[in-house]
Amino acid sequence: MTNQKKRRFLSLLLTLLTACSLIAGTPLTAAGAQISARGSGNERAIPSQDIVILYTNDVHCGIDDNIGYAGLALYKRQMKRETPYVTLVDAGDAIQGAPIGTLSDGGYLIDIMNKVGYDFAVPGNHEFDYRMPRFLELAGKLDCGYYSCNFTSLATGKPVFAPYKMFSYGDTQVAFVGICTPESFTKSSPAYFQDGAGNYLYGFCEDNTGEALYSRIQETVDAARAAGADYIIAVGHLGENGITERWSSDRVVAATSGIDALIDGHSHETVPAKMVKNKEGREILITQTGTKLENIGKMTIKTDGTIKAELVAQVPGDSPQVEYTVRKGDSLSRIAKRELGSYDRWTELYAANRSLITDPDLLRTGMKLVIPGSVLINAEGKAVDYATDAYIKGIEKQYQETLKVVLGYSDYNLTTLNPATGQRAIRNAETNLGDLTADAYRMVLGADIGLSNGGGIRADIKTGNITYNDTLAVFPYGNMGCVVEATG
């Protein structure tokens, strides 16, 4: 190796060493699927208006990716114009996966979920990546709370969170049952669920057959029915393909009865709607949206009692009204009444236009104001909710300067992919980014051999400057480096 190449190689290593130290609606399916909610042997109240359940899974901090949270907020608002019965749920892995999560230990994502207005959420395995004390703190800050029937305290044998939540839509009662994957032990880290002596404090109703999980879910479904639920919607971070089969959503449905539909997550699959027979032979709908807000899930319990599911890949823009020209005699309260329906909303107008308004009592005729809560067509041409978009941009502004710091430079793309096929290879074969991360661990820890977990390398680095943001994208997890000493 020439001296110049050695210097370049060492520069790349130092870049990752520095990072280590710093871290210590267009429907996709127009019809979807529709099933009868009758035939389970139960008399149930049919809704007087459609019940719309919007759902997300595996967002992984993708706040602006694809539809984005601001697009989701807009779509939720659009659905509320069609029916008063709208509920928004998340099936897990929302708060981890990008720098915004890493730098705030998940806090910014909880703030954004509260802004969008979630009504129900289930912990995914990556919700635990910030360790249990922080996760429980975040759970207390999430307005809707987390729900899970099988995440249990081993000391009491009881669920840590409420196992289900009942919603009333007129005379119709719908129970949402939360289910965590028992894979959380291995897909997160066993140490997160133990005390300092290595004793397990928490469990997920895991066993070698799946029966413990099925039994707990069935108990919860039966309890919700006894409490008056007309419909049971399971929200599970379970997955379908590539995960432990006995804990898959398919197996859970097949081993239980009483669930009317299952909203899934964990395996990042795009499943508009598939049908699986339950223990009684009844067809049950399973659906999943993919990842990073590629789609919004829309499930509808219709006025004839049937259940329909579809995926929305694009949010339509409806009557965007971004600017308002101040007229003679206008005041913030008068504009708020005219444009937003209430004099009291003048404070929202003021907050949205602070850069323009120096005195809320004095408005200059002809000045252009933004009406909050209106539709905005953003730079990518996507329709988003203005107020939510502004809120997210305010959060991003708080940490963007830190992320722009340049740590190094690369003449080559550093990749997790097989260059011949373009497929992700880092868990199965050698890649230059995998080699670099292993060398970085070896050097910073003073070891003879460096090992890097391929599953923990989550992004590529393009040719050119390497920023702190790049390294956090590669290493989004709060992992700790370890040294093992062994005799020869």
Place the predicted regions along the sequence by residue.
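Short alpha-helix capping/helix-loop boundary micro-motifs
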Residues: 354-358
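Primarily a LysM-type cell-wall glycan-binding module
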Residues: 319-343, 367
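Acidic, metal/ion-coordinating pockets
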Residues: 32-320, 426-429, 433-440, 450, ...
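Bacterial N-terminal signal peptides
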Residues: 13-25
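Short beta-strand-to-coil "C-cap" segments at the C-terminal boundary of structured domains/repeats
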Residues: 303, 370-374
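Non-catalytic terminal accessory segments
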Residues: 3-7, 11, 22, 31-51, ...
